Amino acid sequence: MLTPLTGRSVIVTGASKGIGKGIALRFGAVGAKVLVVSRKIEDAEAVAGEIVAAGGTARGVAADVSSADDMTAMAEAAVAAHGGIDILCANAGIFPTVPLAEMSVGDYDKVMDTNVKGTFLAVTACLPAMKAKRNGRIVLTSSITGPITGVPFMTHYAASKAAQLGFMRAAALELAPWRITVNAVLPGNIATEGLAGLGPEHVKQMEASVPLRRLGSVFDIANAALFLASDEASYITAQSIVVDGGQILPEGGMMAPELDPAA
């Protein structure tokens, strides 16, 4: 049974597709009032419409997480529409691939602006409303790439995701007096629109690298975010939950053999 969050005001950034959409839909399903945030208003409103059609409460807003003005307006919209801010799921992120030797300062800055500065701006914009309530939940979507593993051609992305965890720990300590917790979810390979675009053979290879022999669902990540935002996680802060089907476990690529279907 999913933890009910009836009436809680939640903001989800990067919520028009993939993991962010899964998080928004899951929070809507448990009674939260969801502010769906995307760069394009039509995309945000489409996801909000799905939540409303399923009996939930949601509103879509357009905002760029790398813009301080947009993040301030986002927080104000949540307060105006839903009476405050209880939960922030800072999910927005980009993950382009560029060989390190060919990476420009612009390539690097674009990733850092969205993934690191965007996290900072989203969190700080929501703090006044959370501090006023002396309570809050902040959940970051990080990655196993950077904090735990490395991937070729994604040096800037790996650096940004590792930076998020440093931010998480320091922020958790600083915000604890207001009973605001700060945690992170670290996804492994998740079945999203972007991953499907790599082609079936590449997807098969990725599935084979996971001990549970499947890619994760966006709802696997959403369920972890939901737990960290719940009352049951009120004594958990500065922690990261790896949701990867055991992807980081195999030593030297060694995994248990497949089961015989006939056994």
Model-assigned labels for residue ranges:
Residues 9, 16-18:
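Conserved glycine-rich cofactor-binding loop
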Residues 103-109, 113, 200-203:
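Short, well-ordered secondary-structure patches that form non-catalytic structural/interaction elements
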Residues 123, 160, 168:
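Active-site helix of classical SDR
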Residues 128, 173-174, 234:
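Alpha-helical segment proximal to the catalytic Tyr-Lys
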Residues 176, 181, 236-238:
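Short, small/polar-rich loop/turn modules that mediate ligand/substrate recognition or access, typified
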Residues 237-263:
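Short C-terminal tail/terminal secondary-structure segment
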